[in-house]
């Protein structure tokens, strides 16, 4: 009898509140059957009713005023279309045909072309910084180990140059290129990405998960100088030396 009264009360409550059919009945504050039932169901709390779906209100945009509609229609164009000369020039202006010098002059006037980029020196070098070797090119930047005592915008000179390469020749050091220097500027002092060091001992309940960030320095290469007086080794000279060595080896192999 108590269960029938509870079902009737719940159905009448849902009909009164007009709750959706897919609503979870656990959201309602229904007293458990283990307690004495008085026949009256307590109304749901406001926090439970706040979970009910609410119809979203549509926002209406304000219409364009009548005095601005004419100007808006003049500049209205299909989507994804580039601006035309007619949007800038007056209506009575007669635009020249595309491809003519007059048309190009107008295009250059409104859309000036960028000048050619400055010529870049085609040269690279291999330099040693902190027991590591780096390939450096003027105009580019690299990350190295922390340079102690260096601050931002400091100019530095790297003297341990192992090799210098140009478009015409190559300068190979023995072990370094004499008087060669790489000029750079310190841009930033920062920390590298975090490295996780995990330590584990079997059957000892010992685990350590410690992180570490290595200090590094970012430098920008500005130039490579001082290699001109060093003897260069070209590809043709290497080929000739190789041919001479092969000829001498063949001459020694021929019996007298």
Swiss-Prot record:
It comes from the Eukaryota. GO terms for biological process: translation. Pfam families: Ribosomal_L21p. The keyword Transport does not apply. The keyword rRNA processing does not apply. One of its GO terms (molecular function) is structural constituent of ribosome. Keywords: Chloroplast, Plastid, Ribonucleoprotein, Ribosomal protein, RNA-binding, rRNA-binding, Transit peptide. GO terms for cellular component: chloroplast; ribonucleoprotein complex; ribosome. It is found in: Plastid, Chloroplast. Residues 1-55 form a transit peptide. Its main location: plastid. InterPro entries: bL21-like, bL21-like_sf, Ribosomal_bL21, Ribosomal_bL21_CS. Component of the chloroplast large ribosomal subunit (LSU). Mature 70S chloroplast ribosomes of higher plants consist of a small (30S) and a large (50S) subunit. The 30S small subunit contains 1 molecule of ribosomal RNA (16S rRNA) and 24 different proteins. The 50S large subunit contains 3 rRNA molecules (23S, 5S and 4.5S rRNA) and 33 different proteins. PANTHER family: 50S RIBOSOMAL PROTEIN L21, LARGE RIBOSOMAL SUBUNIT PROTEIN BL21C. Component of the chloroplast ribosome (chloro-ribosome), a dedicated translation machinery responsible for the synthesis of chloroplast genome-encoded proteins, including proteins of the transcription and translation machinery and components of the photosynthetic apparatus. Belongs to the bacterial ribosomal protein bL21 family. This is Large ribosomal subunit protein bL21c. It comes from Spinacia oleracea. The gene is RPL21.
